[in-house]
Design a protein with these regions (language model features):
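Helix-loop-helix module between adjacent transmembrane segments
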Residues: 31-32, 106-130, 141-174, 178-203, ...
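Selective recognition of specific alpha-helical transmembrane segments in multi-pass small-molecule
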Residues: 109-117, 193-207, 218-238, 271, ...
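N-terminal alpha-helical transmembrane segments of multi-pass membrane transport
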Residues: 1-78, 82, 93-98, 110, ...
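Transmembrane helix-loop junctions in multi-pass membrane proteins
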Residues: 3-4, 34-39, 83-88, 164-176, ...
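Extracellular/periplasmic helix-exit of transmembrane alpha-helices
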Residues: 115-129, 230-246, 254-261, 294-297, ...
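Membrane-interface loop-to-helix entry segments
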Residues: 23-30, 35-47, 156, 173-180, ...
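Alpha-helical membrane segments and immediately flanking helix-loop junctions
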Residues: 56-93, 123, 128-137, 141-143, ...
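Flexible loop linkers connecting adjacent transmembrane helices
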Residues: 37-66, 90-100, 104, 112-147, ...
């Protein structure tokens, strides 16, 4: 298993260092320029559309789609996951505190990318057997005509099923297992069985149950975690100035001051910052367009503005708070990583309740991502094999959730990095090819 893990890590490093680091950020920069800073221009509109008409008793999702808020909640359910707790910790351990700066850079430009994704998902969505559907596979076929477009769309669908439905959900169940083992001493397998059983129940309910669950879980879990982080930062307020100094200085010179991680280079800080940023906010990955395609809006531009808000909440609020808590704790150079590092940081403030707090948050964060990623994979599985084959997909996902809870954390993260990177490539190429369409829609 060690040889296999090493091989996956090396393949992932080649993919990220030689291609994705530049393609992801470059695409975001391109759309920022072409759309004239759309992430700033449309940000206020996104806030208004989500919260201006927000009610706890919104419209129910149906075969014709879901409300704009439900679409955002489903997207954020996928975005706000273990990447905000475990992923942030691994980024800081592998890339040093400066990695958080590169997370911010990729997220800022990623907001322009996700705007393009949501706009195209709305523009090229379709109705199949009376049900609205959409996602990158549809706009990939529009971007590249003929056989090449069909093949590339098929490749994307296979990759997203592997990356999110299977490998990605292994990461989520693995993180829940780690958190509950550290907090309560529960076996990873027992936790995996419980998570798999709850997931199976929700999967059986289809898009209506998915939307109903996510629109209720997401606001509560985010508020719960944010309050916990803010309490710790208030307690550690004297360490905040040094934390921000570390973030900005170590982003360009990882060995320049105390608090850095030995042996880390600028390229590693960038690589892990961008990679973990992608895993967290999913801008450019091609996942969240499946949710945004279903939003009932009057114009594609409206859902694009809403999508921008998802990246902001995920990265600039939730992930940033985690990063600041970890940096101010001073525990990054201590040899801990992943969930254990975050639990140790919270233990400093909350004592024995710290690991329990993170375990509770991890369950809701990771489980909401399982729901969102199942839905994204389901859309592509149905497109490839038909609706009658969906029970097979559901069973396979449940098995991967169960198995993932028992594997070593480095293996599941290595596989997730690799497959997430692969699926982003055809999506980003299609976005660039259809940039003219996005620009035209933005001006309408």
């Amino acid at each position: 298993m060690t040889i296999f893990t090493t091989a996956i890590e090396q393949a992932s490093d080649i993919l990220w260092n030689s291609l994705l680091l530049f393609l992801l950020v470059g695409t975001g920069v391109f759309f920022t320029i072409r759309l004239r800073g759309v992430q700033l221009r449309r940000f206020g509109e996104g806030v208004h559309r989500v919260f201006g008409n927000f009610t706890l008793r919104g419209k129910k999702a149906d075969d014709q789609g879901m409300s704009s808020f439900q679409a955002l909640a489903t997207a954020i359910a996928a975005q706000v996951g273990t990447g905000n707790i475990t992923g942030c910790a691994t980024a800081l351990v592998s890339g040093g505190p400066g990695a958080l700066f590169w997370v911010w850079v990729s997220a800022f430009f990623g907001m322009a990318t996700i705007y393009a994704e949501a706009v195209l998902a709305q523009r090229y969505r379709t109705t199949v057997n009376g049900k609205v559907t959409g996602g990158p596979a549809y706009y990939i076929r529009a971007a590249f005509k003929g056989t090449f477009g069909k093949v590339l769309a098929g490749v994307f669908s296979v990759l997203i099923i592997l990356a999110l439905g299977f490998m990605g959900n292994m990461v989520q169940s693995n993180s829940i297992g780690d958190a509950f083992h550290n907090a309560f001493g529960m076996s990873h397998l027992a936790v995996g069985i419980v998570v798999a059983a709850i997931a199976a129940f929700i999967f059986l309910g289809g898009v209506q149950r998915i939307a109903a669950v996510t629109e209720k879980i997401v606001p509560i879990m985010a508020a719960f975690y944010i309050v916990g982080c803010v309490v710790i930062l208030v307690m550690n307020y004297k360490a905040l100035p040094n934390a921000f100094t570390q973030i900005f200085v170590l982003a360009f010179n990882p060995q320049a001051m105390a608090g850095g991680v030995a042996g880390v280079t600028v390229q590693q800080a960038m690589r892990f910052g961008v990679a973990r940023g992608l895993f967290s906010n999913e801008a450019g990955m091609g996942s969240t367009p499946h949710a945004h395609a279903l939003a009932k809006v009057n114009h594609p531009r409206e859902q694009g503005a809403v999508a921008i808000l998802g990246v902001f909440i995920d990265t600039f609020v939730v992930l940033t708070l985690t990063g600041l808590v970890l940096i101010t704790s001073g525990l990054i150079p201590e040899g801990l990583t992943g969930t254990a590092l975050t639990q140790a940081a919270f233990s400093q403030a909350f004592g024995g309740f710290g690991p329990v707090f993170i375990a509770i948050c991890m369950f809701f964060f990771a489980f909401s991502t399982i729901i969102g990623w199942y839905f994204f994979g389901q859309s592509n599985f149905k497109a490839l094999f038909g609706e009658k084959a969906l029970p097979v997909y559901s069973v396979i996902v449940v098995v991967f959730i169960l198995v993932g809870s028992t594997l070593k954390v480095d293996l599941v993260w290595a596989m997730a990095d690799f497959f997430n990177g692969l699926m982003a490539v055809p999506n980003l190429l299609a976005l660039l090819a259809l940039s003219g369409v996005v620009a035209a829609i933005d001006k309408e």
